[in-house]
Amino acid sequence: MGRVFLTGEKANSILKRYPRANGFFEEIRQGNIERECKEEFCTFEEAREAFENNEKTKEFWSTYTKAQQGESNRGSDWFQFYLTFPLIFGLFIILLVIFLIWRCFLRNKTRRQTVTEGHIPFPQHLNIITPPPPPDEVFDSSGLSPGFLGYVVGRSDSVSTRLSNCDPPPTYEEATGQVNLQRSETEPHLDPPPEYEDIVNSNSASAIPMVPVVTTIK
């Protein structure tokens, strides 16, 4: 008897039916075993119960198993696609972000170079010439006007520039500004000397007449 009848656990393992996802529509539309087996997995025992004929059951089962193998192969192909497509898409997004960051850095660097080339630096060897101070300029605490201090600073800069160029030191006249005066005194006179008569006449004309002083004795 044990060979004919199965226990409850073994019978449930063989004749087990899984609940369908569209159980509500199954009550409205009564289906057949072929459609049910295509929509969900079924066993050989379920097919034999539906057909109640071994030949029809074997014919259906051979076509059903072949169809299941083909769908499993197509499913494995789609599984590889579903696995590789997100990886390729994520790699593309990472490369796009890196390219945009590199583009922004390159644009900022080009803009900085353009600004640097367009800026003309002020030459260091040129001195700034300040205008003369107004007559009503206020003197500082040392008693010297800022204009005089600027003149002294400019002359000291010129003297230091000469010394830096390995020129001989300036003379006293160059340092005090009496070069033009000395040159005017040492230049030869081109006019002829005056005559004696001209000197006498000029002296007599410029002489002050002397008024005699009269004294009275009492």
Curated annotation (Swiss-Prot):
Gla residues are produced after subsequent post-translational modifications of glutamate by a vitamin K-dependent gamma-carboxylase. Residues 21-83 are extracellular. The chain crosses the membrane at residues 84-106. GO terms for biological process: blood coagulation. InterPro entries: Coagulation_fac-like_Gla_dom, GLA-like_dom_SF, GLA_domain, Peptidase_S1_coag_factors. Residues 1-20 form a propeptide. This is Transmembrane gamma-carboxyglutamic acid protein 1. It comes from Homo sapiens.
